[in-house]
Amino acid sequence: MPKAPKQQPPEPEWIGDGESTSPSDKVVKKGKKDKKIKKTFFEELAVEDKQAGEEEKVLKEKEQQQQQQQVQQKKKRDTRKGRRKKDVDDDGEEKELMERLKKLSVPASDEEDEVPAPKPRGGKKTKGGNVFAALIQDQSEEEEEEEKHPPKPAKPEKNRINKAVSEEQQPALKGKKGKEEKSKGKAKPQNKFAALDNEEEDKEEEIIKEKEPPKQGKEKAKKAEQMEYERQVASLKAANAAENDFSVSQAEMSSRQAMLENASDIKLEKFSISAHGKELFVNADLYIVASRRYGLVGPNGKGKTTLLKHIANRALSIPPNIDVLLCEQEVVADETPAVQAVLRADTKRLKLLEEERRLQGQLEQGDDTAAERLEKVYEELRATGAAAAEAKARRILAGLGFDPEMQNRPTQKFSGGWRMRVSLARALFMEPTLLMLDEPTNHLDLNAVIWLNNYLQGWRKTLLIVSHDQGFLDDVCTDIIHLDAQRLHYYRGNYMTFKKMYQQKQKELLKQYEKQEKKLKELKAGGKSTKQAEKQTKEALTRKQQKCRRKNQDEESQEAPELLKRPKEYTVRFTFPDPPPLSPPVLGLHGVTFGYEGQKPLFKNLDFGIDMDSRICIVGPNGVGKSTLLLLLTGKLTPTHGEMRKNHRLKIGFFNQQYAEQLRMEETPTEYLQRGFNLPYQDARKCLGRFGLESHAHTIQICKLSGGQKARVVFAELACREPDVLILDEPTNNLDIESIDALGEAINEYKGAVIVVSHDARLITETNCQLWVVEEQSVSQIDGDFEDYKREVLEALGEVMVSRPRE
C-alpha cells in the first residue's frame, strides 16, 4: 500500500489591512541562516508599516481639509441666506417671542420704570428690545460657536496587527454618521424658536454633545444665564401687578437673598437708577429700619416716585420676607360695594372663610375627619382678627370721608378721587410690612387729612411717604430721607428737625467752599496757574480724606476728592402787589340761597361780609359746597335767592383747582403774560421768575409743562392782575414744600383780603386764618384755633387724638 504523501502544515493566516502575502511562498532552511532570514522579514514588515502609516496620515489630512471646506461653504451659504431673510426673520422672531412670553411681559405704563435689558456678552447688540431677546441672542451665539468648532472625528488605531479590517473601517463609518447627524442637527431652522418645538433635533443635539469633551466653563455660563433669566422673569411678573389697583409683590428668593430670609430691615448700597438717559440716582444707599416712619423729600422731578416704584416692583433687592405695597391707582369701577372692595383685599382671610364653609358642610354630612382641620381654621381666623375685619374696614372708610350710605355704594358710582380713597383704605386695611404712600393727601379734604395724620401716628409697621405737606410730615414721620445730588441723606427726627439740620449743613459747606476759594486765590497770586492751583488743592483734600479714613476706619468714602462747588440754595419767593385801600365791606353775601337744579339747596340764608384785612380758611368735608361758595363770591355763580355785593372798584384774583382750563396751552408762559397784560418780554420773564418758574420753562409751550409749573404761571397771572382780594381754591396742589412756604409768606405780607380752601394744615396755621366751617347748609366761624378743630373732627369720628412729642 503506497504511503500517503506527507501533508504540509497549514499556512498561517496573515492579518493585516494590505494584500495578504503568505511567507510560505519562500522555503526557509533550518540553521543559522534561518535567524537571519526572520530578521530581514520583520525589518521589511516595519518598513511596510511605516509606509502605510504615512499614507493614512496623508488621507486623514485630506479628509479633514475637505470637511473644513464643506463647513466653510455651508456657513457662507447660510450667511447669504440669513442676509436675505434677516428683516423678515427678525420681525417674525420677535413677534413669536412676544406671543410665547405674553404672560410675562410688562405693560409700559411709565417710561421711567422700564426694566433695562441685560448687557449682551462681547459687547454685541441684542436683536430684541427686552431681556428675553437678549437671552435668545446669547443662545444663538453659542450655536454659532459650535458650528465654527465642530466635534473632531474619532482617530483610527495605529496598531494594524491587533485590528481586523472590519474594526478599522468602523471609526470611519462612525465619523461619517456623526457628520450626517451634525448636518441634520445643526441646520439652521427658519426661525430661532423652531428648535424648541422639534424633539428629534433636540435629541440629535444631545447625542452630539455627549460625544464632545465636557466644557465646564460653558455649563457654568449657561447656568448663570438661567439664574439671571429666572430673576428677570420674577421681576417682570412683579412689575406686571395684574392690572390691580396697587402694586403688591413678593419676589422669588435668589441665592443672595436666601441669606436675608429673616431680615426685617432694608439695606441697599451703591445702586443707580436712570430714566430717559437722565441719571436720577448714582451710587446711592437705601437704609430702611423696621417699624420706622420715613418721609422722602426733595425737589420735584428728581426721582422720588421712581424710587418707590422700583422698590414696589423689586427691581432693587428687597429681602423676600418683606411684603411691599405701593398705593398708586384707584380701584376698579364695578358693582362691588366700597366696604367689600376693602375686605376683599385680604385674600388670606377670604380663603380661610371659604375653607370654613367647606369644612362645615362636610361635618353636616357626617364627615368627622374635618373637625380637626376646622379647629385650626378657627384658630387662624382668630389670629388674623377676622371677626373684627368689617368693623376695621368701616372705621377706615369713615375716617376717609365715607358715610354709612357711601360705604355700601358700588365703586362705579364714585368719581376717580373717591375711588382713590377706597384704594388708600385697602392699603391701610392690609397692613403690609412696608407701606409706601405717594402724596396721600392730594385727593383728601382737610377732615380726611386730619384723620389720616392721626391714624398713621399709631402705625406700627414700616412706612415710607412722599408728601409736600410739611405739617403731615412733622406729625407722622420719625425719620427724613433727603434726595439731594443723586444721593439719599438720612436725618433722625421729623421734617422741622431735618430743616434745621440741613440749613446748618449748608452753612458749613458754604464756609468750606469759601475757604477753598481763598486758598485757590492765594496760589494763583503766588504764580500758580489755575490748573496747578486746583491740582494742589485736590492733593491737600486727598491727604485730609486719607487722614480721616485712618482715624475713623471709614471704608465708604473711597472716591477721589473733587473741588467743592458753591452750595445751591433752592429759594422761592412769591410776591403779590399791595392793593389800594378800599372802604369796608368790600365783598359779601346777603340772604343768599343756592342749590343746583334738581338737587336740594347747598346753602340757605347766608349773610356775611369780608374786609380788606380778612384772613379766612373755609373748611369742611368734601361735597358740602366749599368750592361752590367761592364761585358765589367771585360772581361765577348766581344765587337762587339773595345777592352778592362788592365794592365797584374791587378786583378779585381767583385761583381755581382746575386752573389749567384758563391757560392757553399752545402759548408759552411768556407769550401768555405778554398777550394778557401787554407786558414787555423781560418784564413777563421777571414775573415768572419771581414765582419760581425755571428760566428754560419760560419759552416752552404751556401744554408741555408739569402741573407745578402750570400752577406757577397762574400765580404769576394773579400777581399781574393786582387784585384787592385773593380767593384760592386748593392752591398747594402740585407745589413743593419750599413753594408752599413761599406762598404762606406772600399771604402774610399781602395787604388785601385772603379767602382760601386748603387741606394743608401748615398753610392754615402759618397764615393765622380764621376757620369757617361749611355744614348743614350754613357757614359758621369756629371758636378756637386749628388744634381745637382737629379735636372736634376726631371726636365726631369716635377717634382719640394722638399727642406725640415733636422730636
Swiss-Prot record:
Residues 47-64, 147-160, 206-221, 521-542 have a biased composition (Basic and acidic residues). One of its GO terms (biological process) is translational initiation. ATP 2 binds at G620, P621, N622, G623, V624, G625, K626, S627. The gene is ABCF1. This is ATP-binding cassette sub-family F member 1. The modification Phosphoserine is found at S22, S24, S105, S109, S140, S166, S557. Residues 29-39, 73-85 have a biased composition (Basic residues). Phosphorylated at phosphoserine and phosphothreonine. Phosphorylation on Ser-109 and Ser-140 by CK2; inhibits association of EIF2 with ribosomes. Keywords: Activator, ATP-binding, Cytoplasm, Nucleotide-binding, Nucleus, Phosphoprotein, Repeat. It is found in: Cytoplasm; Nucleus, Nucleoplasm; Nucleus envelope. Interacts (via N-terminus) with EIF2S1; the interaction is independent of its phosphorylated status. Associates (via both ABC transporter domains) with the ribosomes. Pfam families: ABC_tran. Gene3D superfamilies: P-loop containing nucleotide triphosphate hydrolases (3.40.50.300). GO terms for molecular function: ATP binding; ATP hydrolysis activity; ribosome binding; translation activator activity. Residues 1-221, 521-564 are annotated as: Disordered. Required for efficient Cap- and IRES-mediated mRNA translation initiation. Not involved in the ribosome biogenesis. PANTHER family: ATP-BINDING CASSETTE SUB-FAMILY F MEMBER 1 (PTHR19211:SF126), ATP-BINDING TRANSPORT PROTEIN-RELATED (PTHR19211). It comes from the Eukaryota. Residues 266-510, 587-802 form the ABC transporter domain. ATP 1 binds at G298, P299, N300, G301, K302, G303, K304, T305. Belongs to the ABC transporter superfamily. ABCF family. EF3 subfamily. GO terms for cellular component: cytoplasm; nuclear envelope; nucleoplasm. Its main location: cytoplasm.
